[in-house]
From Swiss-Prot:
Entry PTM: Carboxylation allows a single lysine to coordinate two nickel ions.
Disulfide bond annotation, renumbered to this chain: none
Primary location class: cytoplasm
Enzyme type, top EC level: hydrolase
Organism of origin: Azobacteroides pseudotrichonymphae genomovar. CFP2
Catalytic function, reaction form: urea + 2 H2O + H(+) = hydrogencarbonate + 2 NH4(+)
List of residues binding substrate: 221
Residues in Urease domain copies: 132-568
Protein's name in the database: Urease subunit alpha
Entry keyword annotation includes Metal-binding: yes
Annotated keywords: Cytoplasm, Hydrolase, Metal-binding, Nickel
Length: 568
């Protein structure tokens, strides 16, 4: 076989086994673990290239046997590994991962990855491919959030709200009549949606009604009263209908302390929002929720990573979002009780240890939806700066394990927590083709292409009046997959099983997808993020110790993936 040096090979066919890539301007380096393509048989498209009739493109197969789209020679980053492969898409789902091409003349072509006459090609050479991100803490305040989310690589929303109502500013609940109306309003938005009903009731009737109307779960929030009776009632209903409960606990400990909340939960599975330094929940020790197997912990973008500006911006944000008054001393005290630099600093460490399992936005309610992905990688880079290599990476000289841990936070673990993992959350055969392609130098900030259900929905695109696609302004723009009936036909509406018949009468176009296994999941099932440390928080000084080690960290003065990437 003819020889070719690595630099030339990577420029033609993408990097291969053993090659190292730096992610953006972070300090994170990944190394290709395996290449599933075949050397000398790589499929590339273009003038004089391989994917032509009788060469890499096969003839004589019926439409059902060949791919609708192939992504060639991409570097996949997923919770399972970091590897190179071709990815095949058929009928909006991932058909196969491996070696694509023409089996008549090429060795090693997977029977599920045949390139034929009807196959479209997206070149993955020199690109990183990830699963679309899942944000499980979205306040549905404005529909324009979808544009920001898609442009950043998010393809699935779980949350609640009714628009810019006072209740939605503070809580992620879509109650009652609004469930159907919000499903109708979002039907042509090219994002998978799931709606949380309002769970704050000590009686079950209203909760059951919302689940039967389509809620995929229920949200408990302190602003509506997260009392022990409310917690117990909602969990009983959730166990009956196999849906998830999300909880924002009692910051001022009015109805009880964290021990009382844990007693009310009574070992049952629950998704705990804001297991963090300043987002709300039992002050100052909500982080202790990370110690328990039945609690699925998540945190949000406002506090991560801990930097010079984190504390300063929090007070104003909190006052606005939770309908508080600067002229009311009690309101000021309420806000200040939630903002603790010691716990904010410790939050990054808990993420790096895999103790906080999921990362979310808290969109327009103190968080920024377009920053879920970039802040995830800012935390990872900052923690490597402070803590060095993870023990799992020390012998390899790369950051593969750390990168897999962090990507799991906004993909597979978010999906597992809400019963979505059978259809989204990873790059796996049979799942919806919600995929994001990145140039390595822009990884985490500006996706090249966002594929939604097998169709390109967003992409970096130049002046539409230009002679080629690349002249400035070269920015993220909606593509054909974001318009018309295609937007709904390539997206899911996640619902409870109890609501199927009711929702069939709503006249929606999105794919109705039932959530599964919400009540049997535990933190032990969450990928690469299931550590349950011993956490002690001093009630007077707010100092945090993790497994007996005092956490003391100064705020970051500079972060990667920040202003440098947003100059133009």
């Amino acid at each position: 076989m003819a020889q070719i040096n690595r630099k030339l090979y990577s420029s033609m066919y993408g990097i291969t086994t053993g090659d190292i890539v730096t992610l953006g301007d972070t300090n994170l380096k990944i190394q290709v673990e395996k290449d599933y393509t075949t050397y000398g048989e790589e499929c590339v498209f273009g003038g004089g290239k391989v994917i032509r009739d009788g060469m890499g493109q096969a003839s004589g197969f019926c439409d059902e046997e060949v791919l609708d789209m192939v992504i060639t020679n991409a570097l996949i980053i997923d919770y399972k590994g970091i590897y190179k492969a071709d990815i095949g898409i058929k009928n909006g789902k991932i058909k196969g991962i491996g070696k694509a091409g023409n089996p008549h003349i090429q060795p090693g072509v997977s029977p599920t990855l045949i390139i034929g006459t009807i196959t479209e090609v997206v070149s993955g050479e020199g690109r990183i491919l990830t699963a679309g991100a899942i944000d499980t803490h979205v306040h549905y305040i404005s529909p324009q959030q979808a544009d920001e989310a898609l442009a950043s690589g998010i393809t699935t929303f779980v949350g609640g709200g009714t628009g810019p109502a006072t209740g939605t500013y503070a809580t992620t609940c879509t109650p009652g009549w609004y469930l159907r109306k919000m499903m109708e309003a979002t039907d042509n938005i090219p994002i998978n949606f799931g709606f949380l009903g309002k769970g704050n009731s000590s009686k079950s009737k209203a909760l059951e009604g919302q689940i039967k109307a389509g809620a995929l779960g229920l949200k408990l929030h302190e602003d509506w009263g997260s009392t022990p009776s409310v917690i117990d009632t909602s969990l009983k209903v959730a166990d009956e209908y196999d849906v998830q409960i999300c909880i924002h606990t009692d910051s001022i400990n009015e109805c009880g302390y964290i021990e009382d909340t844990l007693c009310a939960i009574d070992g049952r599975t629950i998704h705990a929002y804001h297991v963090e330094g300043a987002g709300g929940g039992h002050a100052p020790d909500i982080m202790k929720a990370c110690e328990y197997a039945n609690i699925l912990p998540s945190s949000t973008t406002p506090t991560n990573p801990y930097s010079l500006n984190t504390i300063d911006e929090h007070l104003d944000m909190l006052m606005v979002c939770h309908h508080l008054d600067f002229n009311n001393p009690e309101d000021i005290s309420f806000a200040q009780s939630r903002i603790r630099q010691q716990t904010i600093g410790a939050e990054d460490f808990l993420h790096d240890m895999g103790a906080i399992s999921i990362f979310t936005s808290d969109s327009q309610a103190m968080g920024r939806i377009g920053e879920v992905i970039c802040r995830t990688w800012q935390i990872a880079s900052r923690m490597k700066e402070i803590r060095g290599f993870l023990s799992e990476d020390q012998m390899t000289g790369n950051d593969n394990y750390r990168v897999r841990r962090y990507i799991a936070k906004y993909t597979i673990n978010a999906a597992l927590a809400h019963g979505l993992s059978h259809i989204v959350g990873s790059v796996e055969k049979g799942k919806l083709a919600d995929l994001v392609l990145w140039r390595p130098e822009f990884f985490g900030t500006k996706p090249d292409i966002v594929i939604k259900g097998g169709m390109i929905a967003y992409a970096q695109m130049g002046d539409p009046n230009a002679s080629i696609p690349t002249p400035e302004p070269y920015i993220s723009r909606p593509m054909y997959g974001a318009f018309g009936n295609a937007a709904s036909a390539t997206s899911c509406l996640f619902i409870s099983e109890a609501s199927i018949e009711a929702i069939k009468g709503y006249g929606l176009n999105k794919m109705l997808t039932v959530v599964k296994g919400c009540r049997v999941i535990s933190k032990n099932d969450l990928k690469l993020n299931n550590y349950m440390p011993c956490i002690d928080i001093d009630s007077k000084t707010f100092e945090v110790s993790i497994d007996g080690v005092l956490i003391s960290v100064k705020p970051a003065k500079k972060l990667p993936l920040a202003q440098l990437y947003n100059l133009f």
